[in-house]
């Protein structure tokens, strides 16, 4: 007698582990669901590892489709602004940040059009990682062509690479500057209200508010409701 047993082929299982190396980030990684851009942060546990004890927090929806590809066609140059993949270490230890040039005008840089994604009267938080390049003053804006002043945040880069808020050119409900690791990166962001959505809306990165074509390093743009 012959006994036949069905063999079930199992799909390969991929696994990896993460361990914190120095004070590089307040969380281990971000997970994004491609179908709707929902994101969550996975935190390190008490042993600076990712484990079953790690918490997942701040699940949100990033309204920016290409938040980490600043040279994607979704992002356009303004007044000669450009975004070039850089070779420096990004906030998570890779080489995925961009050197953004401001071009010839104070508002030069890059922008991503998000028309139709905002609701008038609602609050939104726009943030990204920035690191000092050659510029001494940079600005990020939640822009609407029919609204002035737009929700925005301007920082002055000190000679040691530490940014400080320029309150004279900031219009926001709240602002935040958070030091990330020890390599010059800061998470910079603000919360503002979409006062008008009848025009064209976009998020901007304006590296050089002095209009001299200087640069800032940028990574991981995020727009949350």
Short names for language-model regions:
Residues 1-225:
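Extracellular and organelle-lumenal recognition/adhesion modules and their flexible linkers in secreted
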């Amino acid at each position: 007698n012959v006994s036949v047993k069905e063999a079930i082929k199992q799909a390969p299982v991929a696994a990896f582990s993460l361990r914190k190396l120095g004070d590089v980030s307040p969380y281990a990684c971000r997970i994004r669901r491609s179908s709707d851009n929902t994101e969550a942060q996975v935190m390190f546990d008490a042993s600076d590892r990712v484990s079953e004890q790690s918490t997942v927090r701040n699940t949100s929806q990033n309204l920016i489709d290409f938040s980490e590809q600043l040279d994607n066609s979704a992002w356009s140059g303004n007044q000669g602004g450009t975004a070039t993949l850089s070779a420096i270490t990004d906030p998570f230890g890779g080489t995925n940040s961009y050197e953004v040039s401001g071009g010839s005008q104070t508002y030069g840089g890059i922008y991503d059009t998000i028309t139709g994604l905002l609701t008038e009267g609602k609050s939104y938080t726009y943030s990204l990682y920035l690191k000092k390049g050659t510029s001494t003053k940079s600005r990020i804006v939640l822009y609407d062509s029919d609204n002035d002043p737009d929700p925005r945040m301007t920082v002055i880069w000190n000679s040691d690479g530490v940014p400080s808020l320029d309150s004279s050119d900031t219009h926001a409900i709240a602002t935040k500057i958070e030091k990330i690791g020890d390599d010059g990166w800061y998470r910079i962001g603000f919360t503002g209200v979409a006062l008008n959505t009848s025009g064209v809306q976009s998020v901007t990165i304006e590296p050089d508010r002095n209009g001299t074509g200087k640069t800032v390093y940028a990574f991981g743009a995020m727009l949350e409701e």
